Amino acid sequence: MIQMQSTLEVACNSGARRVQCIKVLGGSHRRYAGIGDVIKVSVKEAIPRGKAKKGDVYNAVVVRTKKGVRRPDGSVIRFDRNAAVLLNANLAPIGTRIFGPVTRELRTERFMKIVSLAPEVL
C-alpha cells in the first residue's frame, strides 16, 4: 500500500537507489497504490554515473510491497520492503536489469518486459 510521501527502493539498474512517491496515478482522489500500479516518483538517492539523477521525476510501477497482494486462492504474498521499477514516458523500463523477485500480477501486456527481465516470478 503506497501513498504520497512513501519511500521505495528501486529494483532496476536505472541509477536511482531510493525514490519517493509524489502522486498515485489513476484517478483524481486515488489514495493508495498496490503491486502493478503506476505512480509518479522523485529520485531521492542515486548512484554516480547512472541514468537517473537526484531530483528527477519519473513514472514507476510498484513491484513489491510490505502489504502484499492477495491471490484468489486466499494466499498472500508479502515482501520485506517496498520496491518499484522506473519507467519512461511510454511505460517501458529505463533499466536493463531487474533485481529481486516480482509477482505474477505484473503479467499484463504493459509490464511483460519487467516480468521477462526479473530473476524470479512468484
UniProtKB/Swiss-Prot annotation:
Keyword Cell inner membrane attached: no
GO biological process: translation
Keyword terms of this UniProt record: Ribonucleoprotein, Ribosomal protein, RNA-binding, rRNA-binding
Any matching Pfam family: Ribosomal_L14
UniProt keyword GTP-binding present: no
GO molecular function terms listed in the Swiss-Prot or TrEMBL record: large ribosomal subunit rRNA binding; structural constituent of ribosome
GO cellular component terms given for this protein: cytosolic large ribosomal subunit
InterPro entries recorded: Ribosomal_uL14 (IPR000218), Ribosomal_uL14_bac-type (IPR005745), Ribosomal_uL14_CS (IPR019972), Ribosomal_uL14_sf (IPR036853)
Domain of life: Bacteria
Protein family membership: Belongs to the universal ribosomal protein uL14 family.
SUBUNIT field: Part of the 50S ribosomal subunit. Forms a cluster with proteins L3 and L19. In the 70S ribosome, L14 and L19 interact and together make contacts with the 16S rRNA in bridges B5 and B8.
The protein's role, per its UniProt record: Binds to 23S rRNA. Forms part of two intersubunit bridges in the 70S ribosome.
Protein name, per record: Large ribosomal subunit protein uL14
